[in-house]
């Protein structure tokens, strides 16, 4: 059987960019572990703020962090109190000067990470995995997606044998590199164990297609 490559990693350098932007020689491993700690800390602290992704840039002894969220008000807090507390916590965590930017996600239903997290939260609240997937697919298609596929794996409905069930609508061209496909995973902790959630969202083509010139000067 053929295995599916991560659609985001496959498109880096074509239509996607890196989420960590820095150069390191012998400090590479330290920077990588620090990035993982920063992302884990932010995702835990802002678990209710619908955080999609965290971009990290480095310059000398300074770390620039960009948080993509659907609820910027929760991240900033009253008068900027929350984001200032977060900055101080990250300062002590990294030992470097941290600058935080916040970008709002206008359409949360077109963001694969937020969609996957939403399905996972519904599964934790004992909503049927079929209903959770079908409702989310309808919302995403209404938001303007050209295609979506969702998959939930694990002990579905408390079954003894784990299995996977997926639903899709529209088209999701995984082989087309110019196709803007957002992919994300999430986990749901249920009484029967963990359920894995995967989401692919096709948002249209990014690069313009070249017009074919007719031969013979016609």
Curated annotation (Swiss-Prot):
Residues 38-106 form the KH type-2 domain. GO terms for molecular function: mRNA binding; rRNA binding; structural constituent of ribosome. GO terms for cellular component: cytosolic small ribosomal subunit. Keywords: Ribonucleoprotein, Ribosomal protein, RNA-binding, rRNA-binding. InterPro entries: KH_dom, KH_dom-like_a/b, KH_dom_type_2, KH_sf_prok-type, Ribosomal_S3_C_sf, Ribosomal_uS3_bac-typ, Ribosomal_uS3_C, Ribosomal_uS3_CS. SMART domains: KH. Pfam families: KH_2, Ribosomal_S3_C. One of its GO terms (biological process) is translation. Part of the 30S ribosomal subunit. Forms a tight complex with proteins S10 and S14. Binds the lower part of the 30S subunit head. Binds mRNA in the 70S ribosome, positioning it for translation. NCBIfam families: rpsC_bact. This is Small ribosomal subunit protein uS3. The gene is rpsC.
């Amino acid at each position: 059987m053929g295995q599916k490559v991560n659609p985001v990693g496959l498109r880096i350098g074509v239509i996607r960019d890196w989420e960590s932007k820095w150069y390191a020689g012998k400090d590479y491993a330290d920077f990588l572990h620090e990035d993982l700690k920063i992302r884990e800390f932010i995702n835990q602290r802002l678990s209710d703020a619908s955080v999609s992704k965290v971009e990290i840039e480095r310059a000398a002894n300074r770390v620039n962090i960009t948080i993509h969220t659907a609820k910027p008000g929760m991240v900033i807090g009253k008068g900027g109190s929350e984001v200032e507390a977060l900055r101080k916590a990250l300062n002590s965590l990294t030992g470097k000067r941290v600058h935080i930017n916040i970008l709002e996600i206008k359409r949360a239903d077109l963001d694969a990470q937020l969609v996957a997290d939403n399905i996972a939260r519904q599964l934790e609240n004992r909503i049927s995995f079929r209903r959770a997937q079908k409702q989310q697919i309808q919302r995403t298609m209404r938001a303007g997606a050209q295609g979506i596929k969702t998959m939930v794996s694990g002990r579905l409905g408390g079954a003894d044998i784990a299995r996977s069930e997926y639903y899709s609508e529209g088209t999701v061209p995984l082989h087309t590199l110019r196709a803007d496909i957002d992919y994300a995973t999430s986990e749901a902790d249920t009484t029967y164990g963990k359920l894995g959630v995967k989401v692919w969202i096709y948002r249209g083509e990014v690069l313009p297609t070249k017009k074919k010139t007719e031969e013979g000067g016609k």
